[in-house]
Regions:
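Conserved C-terminal alpha-helix-loop-beta "cap" of PLP-dependent enzymes
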Residues: 115-259
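Conserved PLP-enzyme active-site core in the AAT-like
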Residues: 1-123
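Generic detection of long, well-ordered alpha-helical segments
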Residues: 97-100, 104, 181-184, 260
């Protein structure tokens, strides 16, 4: 409403929401909430090759403007492999209602199995005032004697489960419609087993990440002319950073190159 009040178009980064239209169990899609256009990364949550994405709009005038500008910025040598993957993905979505129904059933089952974890915690809609995508299983380690990064490491090395990302206080397990009931059983079994070996308390190896910025020595573009070295994070106080410090790209960095 604010955008439209001022004559602006609203473009939503809905990269992780390409699966939203296919079940009422997921949040409402951006275009249904008033957005003029949205970007959907098919490869993140649907069966499509990496790099495949869609730019969708419900505004015919905006569609014409986008088409004109795409002619300027798009490559003249598109990948027909990627475009074919997009078409295959869309065909799958149109003809796989039962798959999405089964997927949502598996998501609810795994959450039911994990609701009684003693030290780890699975976030759900009751933990936020915002809508929540149940396809992303957020595992909090805030009240356990283990960090999120360590939990992700154990899941990878001991259970062959690769998580989407790990942070000091949580892990995100990204799921998709292509995950099987067996895969969800593996995840729940692994977390129940790990939880049984934990105790209450904060992990002593966690590094506080708040208020790291203390000043700026150089612009990032000036750093190429200086020598650089790799040192432990604990020894970096008052040193100039030569790279970004962030939990994941393209997230907001805590420190950028040139800062102290």
């Amino acid at each position: 409403e604010i955008c439209h009040k001022h004559g602006a178009k609203l473009l939503v980064d809905e990269a992780h929401g390409a699966h939203f239209p296919f079940s009422d169990s997921f949040p409402d899609e951006a275009l249904n909430c008033g957005a003029d256009a949205a970007v959907l990364s098919l490869h993140k949550t649907l069966p499509s090759l990496t790099q495949t994405a869609l730019l969708i709009t419900n505004d015919s005038e905006l569609s014409e403007i986008i088409a004109e500008n795409l002619a300027v910025f798009e490559t003249s040598s598109p990948s027909y492999i990627l475009m074919s993957s997009i078409e295959k993905c869309l065909d799958f979505c149109e003809n796989s209602k039962d798959k999405f129904k089964e997927y949502c059933c598996n998501l609810k089952t795994v959450r039911e199995k994990l609701k009684n974890l003693k030290y780890l915690k699975i976030y759900d809609k009751s933990d936020t005032d915002f809508d929540y995508d149940i396809g992303k299983i957020v595992i909090s380690t805030a009240n356990a004697n283990i960090s999120g990064t360590k939990l992700a490491e154990i899941l990878r090395n001991n259970y062959q489960i690769e998580t989407e990302m790990a942070y000091p206080d949580y892990v995100i397990a990204m799921t998709s419609v292509c995950d099987t009931e067996k895969a969800f059983d593996m995840l729940s079994g692994a977390l129940i087993s790990i939880d049984s070996e934990l105790s209450k308390g904060a992990d002593t190896e966690r590094v506080p990440l708040k208020n790291l910025y203390t000043g700026k020595n150089f612009n990032a573009c000036e750093l190429y002319k200086f020598n650089k070295e790799t040192i432990p994070f604990q020894n970096s106080e008052f040193r100039t950073s030569a790279e970004y410090i962030w939990a994941y790209p393209p997230g907001i960095p805590l420190i950028v190159p040139g800062e102290i």
